């Protein structure tokens, strides 16, 4: 910081010296110094001069104070973190490490045939990338297949079906497996996902698959004590996983068709199975469904259970688990004070913030630091597309996965989007990637998950120090020119012509100096291609 302000003062002195040099003619500085002695000059000064001098010095001091405060406000936290890290790096390891670009399955993923394919037919654009669909195929193989399936024709066929690239081939292969075994639940799941035109049709096929897997589970002994995670038969565990997956998709069908109580009951029943609900991220579905029925107390309890919201632990110091958790907790805090921000003006900010409003703004800022791509979609600044089947935490894909399903919850609370807009406008100039570790490969990895026609959101960039210095000196130069044009309007045009003439002369002198030591044909020589001379 000291180097920056040293450079600032040196540049200021140089600027004043250059300005006095160019104004020596119009202001007749040399004639004044020759004709008037220092003693007589100071004796002839009036009290108005001292008043103007005092006011000018106060103005300059105020400008310097404002820029110092601006600099410390934007950079004090970063420099303090760097100093503390350099002092303690020998004794304490830095806990903030850059996370890997791990791909997470979207728990709110849509149905391919009933929703994604309808979008493709309407817009003639592919909503999913091959990389995203390939990851889904790998997930289905890990969930619906096991090593004991060898020798069972229908399951061996389904192993091939999940690997097929084209949707028609997967559907035909699944129908072949159903021809062998009409109770093949994994084949029915594939057909429900990719061979139905509406969500209601997908629900009917999934209910058929649920009956089939329940019939299969009823054949096992001691089924009443079988649960995921115990030491038991691998095939039984696989079938329990299929049953949980089908129940989750059936609850999602109920949610999409407006049967909210049925959907919430289904998600709650699934959340009691800790291992499977965590694997499939059922809590995200349950939180979204509770927000739809405006059961905010239940949402708060879920956040306490899954993310530690509102507890006295070190929740504010650790990184949030997801954008859904962080923005939902912020939404609950915003809801308590959103009435004060219903008007789009910033009068509520000017009158001073209460403790509840300050807490809401801190929660929004913390959520934006985790994933700054979400607010432009919630505020409808950026065009939204259909969410991918997988996302990367802190990436544009996660922002789409959250905003696509939660934007109506923000619109339902009057004043929530107004407060979000105010905090977002204040957040962008002060954004800091170092608050939470940010992988430099995140944006390139997001391109693999999002369609090529989508304009990917970039991480907000902080304004560089050089840019702030240039803006500062440009502002000061404009102020000086405005004062000169007001005080000496007759000499102002002559001064501008002299400055332009001096600039042209400096350019001509530099070109003459360059041409003296450089050959005349240096430009054609540099522009020409090297010619290979054949050996004799």
From Swiss-Prot:
The chain crosses the membrane at residues 3-23, 49-69, 464-484. Keywords: Coiled coil, Membrane, Transmembrane, Transmembrane helix. It is a multi-pass membrane protein. Pfam families: ST7. Disulfide bonds: none annotated. The keyword Membrane applies. Residues 192-219 form a coiled coil. It is found in: Membrane. One of its GO terms (cellular component) is membrane. Belongs to the ST7 family. This is Protein ST7 homolog. It comes from Caenorhabditis briggsae.
């Amino acid at each position: 910081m000291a180097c920056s302000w040293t450079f600032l003062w040196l540049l200021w002195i140089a600027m004043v010296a250059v300005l006095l040099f160019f104004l020596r003619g119009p202001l007749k500085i040399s004639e004044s110094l020759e004709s008037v002695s220092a003693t007589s000059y100071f004796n002839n000064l009036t009290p108005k001069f001292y008043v103007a001098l005092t006011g000018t010095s106060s103005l300059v001091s105020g400008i310097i104070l404002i820029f110092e405060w601006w600099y410390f406000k934007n950079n004090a936290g970063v420099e303090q973190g760097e100093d503390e890290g350099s002092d303690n790096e020998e004794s304490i390891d830095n806990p903030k490490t850059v996370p890997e670009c791990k791909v997470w399955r979207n728990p709110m993923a849509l149905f391919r045939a009933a929703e994604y394919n309808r979008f493709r037919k309407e817009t003639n654009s592919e909503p999913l990338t091959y990389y995203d669909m390939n990851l889904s195929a790998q997930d289905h193989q890990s969930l619906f297949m096991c090593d004991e399936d060898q020798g069972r024709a229908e399951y061996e066929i389904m192993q091939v079906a999940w690997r097929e690239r084209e949707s028609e081939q997967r559907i035909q292969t699944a129908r072949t497996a159903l021809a062998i075994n009409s109770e093949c639940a994994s084949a029915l799941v594939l057909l429900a996902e990719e061979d139905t035109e509406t969500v209601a049709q997908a629900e009917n096929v999934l209910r058929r698959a649920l009956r089939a897997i329940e019939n299969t589970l009823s054949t096992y002994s001691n089924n009443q004590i079988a649960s995921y995670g115990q030491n038991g038969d691998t095939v039984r565990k696989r079938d329990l996983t299929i049953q949980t997956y089908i129940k989750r998709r059936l609850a999602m069908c109920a949610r999409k068709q407006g049967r909210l109580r049925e959907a919430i009951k289904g998600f709650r029943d699934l959340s009691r199975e800790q291992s499977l609900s965590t694997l499939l991220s059922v809590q995200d579905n349950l939180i979204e469904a509770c927000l739809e029925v405006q059961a905010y107390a239940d949402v708060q309890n879920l956040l306490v259970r899954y993310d530690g919201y509102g507890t006295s632990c070190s929740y504010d110091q650790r990184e949030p688990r997801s954008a859904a958790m962080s923005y939902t907790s912020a939404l609950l805090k915003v809801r308590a004070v959103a009435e004060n921000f219903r008007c789009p003006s910033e009068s509520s900010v000017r009158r001073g913030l209460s403790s509840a409003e300050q807490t809401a703004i801190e929660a929004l800022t913390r959520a934006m630091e985790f994933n700054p791509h979400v607010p432009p979609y919630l505020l409808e600044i950026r065009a939204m597309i259909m969410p991918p089947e997988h996302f990367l935490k802190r990436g544009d894909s996660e922002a789409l996965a959250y905003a696509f399903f939660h934007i109506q919850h923000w619109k339902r609370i009057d004043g929530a989007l107004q407060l979000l807009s105010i905090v977002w406008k204040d957040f962008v100039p002060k954004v800091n990637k170092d608050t939470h570790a940010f992988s430099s490969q995140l944006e390139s990895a997001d391109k693999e998950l999002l369609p090529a026609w989508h304009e990917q959101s970039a991480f907000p960039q902080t304004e560089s120090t050089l840019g702030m210095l240039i803006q500062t000196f440009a502002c000061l130069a404009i102020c000086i020119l405005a004062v000169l044009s007001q005080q000496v309007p007759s000499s102002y045009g002559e001064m501008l012509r002299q400055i332009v003439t001096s600039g042209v002369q400096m350019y001509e002198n530099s070109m003459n100096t360059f041409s003296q030591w450089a050959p005349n044909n240096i430009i054609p020589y540099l522009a020409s291609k090297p010619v290979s001379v054949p050996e004799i």
